[in-house]
């Protein structure tokens, strides 16, 4: 069987956890392929139980599914153990979680540097979560990182941490006037934490490719979203990894020819957390309505999300960049009770119209949305389970988004629950 990639098509928080949870009962593997605990997935089970996951794949909540933290992820050991403990206390079987030996470990000095750099950045700060993600990826690229497999050899681990702290302590003490970290203490704490996860360390790329050869289905789950991609997003207001479809292959060890379906997740409106351009952002009562009705507060940061109307320009861009084959449209129910529902179909920049993503960040920062207004609907759609159950105006809205985004809207979320979903096309069915 092929691998399937699940991609956020906006600035994150699109509802990827709901999509993974919906598909999880029909796949054998769920893989997190990038990011760290700077993002969160919310899953609401049929029982009404609400789970917020930050590092562990959403498939952990589905019996029988093997979950993998892939090589593209940066893992904070303390956060991992806390999340595992929280799941186990609620009766979740966590034995089905594996961690790639090649994933990088997020160290205390990464968090310390992240926080002081953001604080000193002043007006130029980018809105980092302060969890050390960026500095950890910096060390990975600079070939100074600590990998998960290093905890299996304490001597090698100690040597690597001592080498890293020779430089990190210089930065912390001499530039930022912070206290130096003791290498022996860092090593001791990490080895103690490793006792709680080293039995999970695995050659993930081998296991995943063997699973595909056995015709098992592998679901690759991204965090954040396309517009936060370090290469394809609204740079520099981005994350430090590649949440796009290309990152799924790199961050899991599964070759690109084995990926046949790319499922993009789109919210029926647009949100963003932190700094950066946001052409359709609302500062009026409509923005307040979307924030309140949609419960728009970040799962990981607790920060209020900025809210705006649906932006078809970035949706079309996400389709192109990721090769999206299908869309899962979430939170359509939030738009009920609006007299009209605007859709951004293009931008004007210095008086000139464009329907494509601006090439430069200065252009996108000046982009003014061009809206097309569709009539709203007043009916409660949370009980709809077939497309024809939706009011005609809601169906028209979905079909217009589909046309503008350039890929089929195969699933529609009409509420937070697993069962509050309309399936127009089975994305797991053989094509």
UniProtKB/Swiss-Prot annotation:
Substrate binds at residues 299-305. Pathway: Purine metabolism; AMP biosynthesis via de novo pathway; AMP from IMP: step 1/2. InterPro entries: Adenylosuccin_syn_GTP-bd, Adenylosuccin_syn_Lys_AS, Adenylosuccinate_synth_dom1, Adenylosuccinate_synth_dom2, Adenylosuccinate_synth_dom3, Adenylosuccinate_synthetase, P-loop_NTPase. The keyword Ligase applies. GO terms for biological process: 'de novo' AMP biosynthetic process; IMP metabolic process. Keywords: Cytoplasm, GTP-binding, Ligase, Magnesium, Metal-binding, Nucleotide-binding, Purine biosynthesis. It is an enzyme of class 6 (ligase). Mg(2+) binds at residues 13, 40. One of its GO terms (molecular function) is magnesium ion binding. One of its GO terms (cellular component) is cytoplasm. It is found in: Cytoplasm. Its EC number is 6.3.4.4. The keyword Metal-binding applies. Binds 1 Mg(2+) ion per subunit. Its cofactor is Mg(2+). The active site is at 13 (proton acceptor), 41 (proton donor). It catalyses: IMP + L-aspartate + GTP = N(6)-(1,2-dicarboxyethyl)-AMP + GDP + phosphate + 2 H(+). GTP binds at residues 12-18, 40-42, 305, 331-333, 413-415. SMART domains: Adenylsucc_synt. IMP binds at residues 13-16, 38-41, 129, 143, 224, 239, 303. CDD domains: AdSS. Belongs to the adenylosuccinate synthetase family. Homodimer. Plays an important role in the de novo pathway of purine nucleotide biosynthesis. Catalyzes the first committed step in the biosynthesis of AMP from IMP. This is Adenylosuccinate synthetase. It comes from Mycobacterium sp. (strain KMS). The gene is purA.
């Amino acid at each position: 069987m092929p691998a399937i990639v699940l991609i956020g098509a906006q600035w994150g928080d699109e509802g990827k956890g709901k999509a993974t949870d919906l598909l999880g009962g029909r796949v054998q593997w769920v893989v997190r392929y990038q990011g760290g605990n700077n993002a969160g997935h919310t899953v609401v089970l049929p029982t009404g139980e609400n789970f917020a996951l930050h590092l562990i794949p959403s498939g952990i909540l589905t019996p029988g599914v093997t979950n993998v933290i892939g090589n593209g992820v940066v893992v904070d050991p303390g956060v991992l153990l806390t999340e595992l403990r929280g799941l186990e206390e609620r009766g979740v079987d966590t034995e089905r979680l594996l961690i790639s030996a090649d994933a990088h470990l997020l160290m205390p000095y990464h968090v310390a540097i992240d926080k002081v750099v953001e604080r000193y950045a002043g007006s130029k700060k980018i809105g980092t979560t302060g969890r050390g993600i960026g500095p950890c990826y910096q060390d990975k690229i600079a070939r100074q990182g600590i990998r998960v497999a290093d905890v299996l050899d304490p001597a090698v681990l100690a040597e690597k941490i001592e080498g890293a702290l020779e430089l990190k302590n210089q930065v912390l003490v001499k530039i930022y006037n912070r206290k130096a970290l003791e290498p022996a203490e860092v090593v001791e704490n990490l080895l103690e934490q490793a006792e709680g996860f080293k039995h999970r360390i695995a050659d993930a790329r081998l296991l995943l490719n063997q699973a595909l050869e056995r015709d098992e289905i592998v679901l690759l789950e991204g965090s954040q979203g396309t517009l936060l991609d370090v290469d394809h997003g609204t740079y520099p207001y981005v994350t430090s990894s590649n949440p796009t479809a290309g990152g799924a292959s790199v961050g899991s060890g599964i070759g690109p020819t084995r990926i046949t379906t790319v499922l993009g997740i789109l919210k029926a409106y647009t949100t963003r957390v932190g700094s950066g351009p946001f052409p359709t952002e609302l500062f009026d009562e409509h923005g307040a309505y979307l924030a309140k009705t949609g419960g728009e507060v970040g799962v990981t940061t607790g920060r209020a999300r900025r809210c705006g109307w649906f932006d078809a320009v970035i949706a079309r861009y996400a389709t192109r960049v990721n090769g999206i084959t299908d869309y899962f449209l979430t939170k359509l129910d939030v738009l009920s009770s609006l007299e009209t529902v605007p859709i951004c179909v293009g931008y004007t920049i210095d008086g000139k119209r464009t329907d494509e993503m601006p090439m430069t960040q200065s252009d996108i920062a000046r982009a003014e949305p061009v809206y097309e207004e569709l009539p709203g609907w007043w009916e409660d759609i949370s009980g709809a389970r077939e497309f024809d159950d939706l009011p005609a105006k809601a169906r028209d809205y979905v079909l217009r988004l589909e046309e503008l985004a350039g890929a089929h809207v195969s699933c529609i979320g009409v509420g937070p629950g697993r069962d509050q979903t309309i399936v127009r096309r089975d994305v797991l069915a053989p094509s």
